[in-house]
Every structure is written in C-alpha cells, then in structure tokens.
C-alpha cells in the first residue's frame, strides 16, 4: 500500500505548516513554539492540504497539488489540480482554461517552478 502524503498551507499565517494525522483528524504545529493546535475538522478554512501526486519533475522533485509547472516544449505554465478523481495540469489559454492529464505533461519534461500560494504571478503570465 502506498503512503499518502500531503503538505499544508496555513492561509492565515501565509506559510507552510507542519501537521500530523491522528484518528482521521489533522492537527497543526506552530513552527515557532512547537505546540500542536487546532484540527482540520474545526479550522478547515484556515488551511489547504495538498496531496502528493507520486510523480516527479525533470529534476526529481516531487509534484504536489497546487504546484506550478513549466513545460519548456510548449513554453507553458501549468497549475496542478485534483479534479474528477485524477490529477490534472491546467493552463489558461486566450479565452478559457485547458486541462490535461498530469502524466501527459510530466512525460513532456516539466519542472516545478513554484506553487499557487507563494508564486501566483506565474499563472498570470
């Protein structure tokens, strides 16, 4: 069985957060004090959990939901999303968003260049 991994963005503090899962509840740790607080069930709107896709970019870096990929062949930036039960890569065309299976973009040779929280400007280009 594969290990399901996540990373956690704290929307309130605008930074990555440590977390642990105990009996289906997600708890978060304050990096400054080391104290565990809250739970995902009670404060879900303050946090975004992003799942690991089990895919890696051309440099061997793991790809997570919310990552921004650059694919040099088409010279496009893609946002990694989870929709309809699968990981997808999407980019904004002239008039609409275009969606592809993530594996198809990874095969083309993409690189993780940021994420939607720390580098939103990459998706505006």
Language-model segments: residues:
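Secondary-structure transition motif
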Residues: 1-125
